Amino acid sequence: MKYDYLVVGSGLYGAIFAHEAKAHGKSVLVVDKRPNIAGNIYTENIEGINVHKYGAHIFHTNNKKVWNYITRFAEFNRFTNSPVANYKGELYSLPFNMYTFNKMWGVVTPEEAAAKIEEQRREITHEPQNLEEQAISLVGRDIYEKLIKGYTEKQWGRDCKDLPTFIIKRLPVRLTFDNNYFNALYQGIPIGGYTKMIANLLDGIEVRLNTDYLKNKAALDALADKIVYTGPIDAYFDYKLGTLEYRSVRFENELLDKPSFQGNAAVNYTDRETPWTRIIEHKWFEFGKDENGNDLPKTIISREYSSEWKPGDEPYYPVNDAKNGALYAEYKKLADTEPKVIFGGRLGEYKYYDMDQVIAAVLDRCESELH
């Protein structure tokens, strides 16, 4: 059988494109090299807990069209991201807000907090030359030393004095008692996990798992009139112009026979000495309860480590610097010469996308492609 579309990758971009194509009467085949659907938003149910296997994914958006679309495929809970920072046993609220400043300096009013930050910012009197100076010029030395320096150095594997200023363009400072990390109208986690949501999108569509498109390209290409490719763009072209760089993350998962480990979904470890950057406790994304509302007796934590990416590792975050941007632009020119192929998603477009941005991008693409 010849399909109208072959969709490579069953993550958010691929699943939505496949769903929309089918809704427009097109025949679709989805292939994925992993043994499961859902790409990096894959959640696995272990002991009643939906574990975010490729790192925490918290849905947030101000885009009503996107929200109305995705909530057709899942009911979302009211989870609000309120991370905690642990600096050598001292706990601080994130993002930086009045709870943070009260703990740091004992200040009680927004006026006192603003004055303290202003006083500390004055340490940098010249144009910041590196990330350390940039951060101090924005929020002062105390917050930098305790809540930014160690965490950032672990994330990037470099000293803050050797990192460019553009990594921290701005640091949100809230002079209110507000722990809600995302200032978004809509926020939450799909009840029952993301995998269930992707399964709903792919309902009635043929999916072949454990199928590596790039290793079987000619045979798979022959099956369809057009290809939607959501894998790494440089891999598609066999890295012939060079390798695009990513930041990678490594997870150590642990099942614990107790009801709670840290009492919060995310705790960032902001000192340099603790090797992990943060610990995720997955059950709190769904308030510690199973799908029937019962308390879960066990818990699962994931220690997260930043790691230097090398070819073959799982690509997580594109490194959007000038060098990689220029290389992507060259690959994009090659992609434009492939009229049968649509390149989409975080890897296909080498773009740091939040989930709502992926949804908006694929719906736009469907609009132009399928109508």
Predicted regions and their residues:
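Short, solvent-exposed loop/turn segments at secondary-structure junctions
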Residues: 12-13, 35-36, 99, 153, ...
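Glycine-rich FAD pyrophosphate-binding loop
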Residues: 19-47
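N-terminal FAD cofactor-binding segment of flavoenzymes
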Residues: 56-90
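Short glycine/proline- and charge-enriched loop/turn segments
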Residues: 45-53, 179-181
